[in-house]
Design a protein with these regions (language model features):
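Glycine-rich phosphate-binding loop and adjacent beta-alpha segment
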Residues: 265-335, 368-370
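A short acidic, Gly/Pro-enriched loop at the edge of an enzyme's catalytic core
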Residues: 249-257
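Mid-domain Rossmann-like dinucleotide-binding core that forms the NAD(H)/NADP(H) cofactor-binding site
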Residues: 171-242
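C-terminal hydrophobic helical "lid"/dimerization subdomain
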Residues: 2-12, 43, 317-370
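Glycine-rich beta-strand-centered segment in the early N-terminal region that forms part
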Residues: 70-85, 99-145
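NAD(P)H dinucleotide-binding glycine-rich loop of Rossmann-like/cofactor-binding domains
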Residues: 92, 105-118, 125, 138-200
Length: 370
């Protein structure tokens, strides 16, 4: 088994690196120029402030510009944004890293230059085919261009905000909380009483994963640094391991599900502390320009056919029904938000820099309210 795994792993690595190199070479053949239809504002059109990402690079490539205010298509909703949230998804897209992702996001420059994804705001107008929302509704969801005063989205990518939930708290949910929910429910297939370990319990996804796993009846162990131990415990974790003092992969406890946002231990190390038919769900991993966090999932995919345990990558998808479920958890008091820092729209580059450091406790918010 080990020999077949190593051969398959090597072949797939060669293919992945070749594709990545091809994408990188092509990326250097294209100039980074303003996209047509964005820089040019129609005469008499309304404008708005928006953060724009025209080129791959550091946060310095992000610019705050006046662009044309969007109008909703027949199946779209126009929302005035009051708050947005930062995710690793944003800065991976900003840098075009790992390079392999450029095959989808654009080789020479980003295809989608409106920046940001998580939003919360008030519906201003709806297309004629929209039935789920109406003008004045408070909504949250995920759509391209969240770091702006307005955006349009399709109604299946959002849900109503409960009356007692703030725009900032609602904006914190979409990518991070949906990733946690789908990882635990769909990939982890958690059952009441199972032992679940969350590696990276103090981050954006991790803080939600701890709470959602508890709401599903699991016995939860959270992994975090010393300064976050009490915070993770306050979210409901039954056990908290300080990774600066103890290595969970060297302990005697066996876990039914491990959700990993960090990628600081090998698959074999994690397998040692998994139950015989346990599940290992990869959400994040170590940085790197070539394959980055994709290296772990590639190895897991190759290993899966040869073992009883299940290992794989979690790729979340924005879903209005899941957002509504998260809203219900908040209404019932089973899900709360940890906000680390707040930034204004003009400070988005600073927010991205802080997110890239990898030490945020919970969520980073972009506030558009006066």
């Amino acid at each position: 088994m080990k020999l077949r795994y190593k051969i398959a792993s090597g072949l797939l690595m060669i293919v992945a690196v070749a594709i990545t190199a091809f994408a990188l070479v092509l990326s250097h053949t294209s100039a980074c120029e303003p996209a047509a239809g964005i820089a040019d504002i129609a005469e008499g059109a309304e404008t708005m402030k928006a953060v724009v990402n025209r080129c791959y690079g550091s946060p310095d490539v992000l610019t705050l510009e006046d662009i044309e205010k969007p109008s909703p298509a027949n199946d779209e909703v126009l929302v005035k944004v009051h708050a947005a949230a930062v995710n690793p998804y944003d800065w991976h897209g900003m840098r075009g890293s790992p390079y392999l992702m450029r095959l989808g996001t654009g080789l020479g420059a980003p295809k989608q230059i409106r920046f940001g994804a998580d939003f919360a705001g008030t519906v201003e107008a709806v297309g004629k085919d929209v039935t789920k929302f109406k003008s004045g509704d408070r909504v949250f969801g995920g759509a391209a261009g969240a770091f702006a005063e307005y955006l349009t989205f399709r109604e299946n990518r959002a849900a109503l905000i409960p009356d007692d939930v703030s725009f900032e708290d609602a904006a914190s949910l979409p990518i991070a909380a949906i990733t946690a929910l789908q990882a635990l429910r769909d990939k982890g297939k958690i059952e009441p009483g199972q032992k679940v370990l969350i590696n990276g319990a103090s981050g954006g996804v991790g803080t939600f994963a701890v709470q959602i796993a508890k709401s599903m009846g699991a016995e939860v162990t959270g992994i975090c640094s010393t300064r976050n131990v009490e915070m993770v415990r306050s979210l409901g974790a039954d056990h908290v391991i300080d990774y600066t003092k103890d290595d969970y992969t060297k302990g005697d406890e066996k876990y039914d599900v491990i959700v990993d946002m960090v990628g600081n231990h090998s698959l074999s190390e994690n397998r040692r502390v998994m139950s015989p038919e346990g599940r290992f769900v990869i959400i994040g991993g170590l940085k790197g320009d070539w394959l980055g966090p994709l290296m772990g999932p590639i190895k897991a995919m190759l290993m899966n056919p040869f073992i009883d345990q299940e290992m794989g990558l979690m790729i979340a998808h924005m879903d209005g029904d899941d957002l509504a479920e998260l809203a219900k958890l908040m209404e019932r008091g089973e899900l709360s938000v940890v906000i680390d820092r707040r930034y204004s729209l003009s400070e988005v580059p600073d927010a991205i820099r802080y997110s890239e450091e990898g030490h945020a406790r919970g969520k980073i918010i972009i506030s558009l309210e006066p």
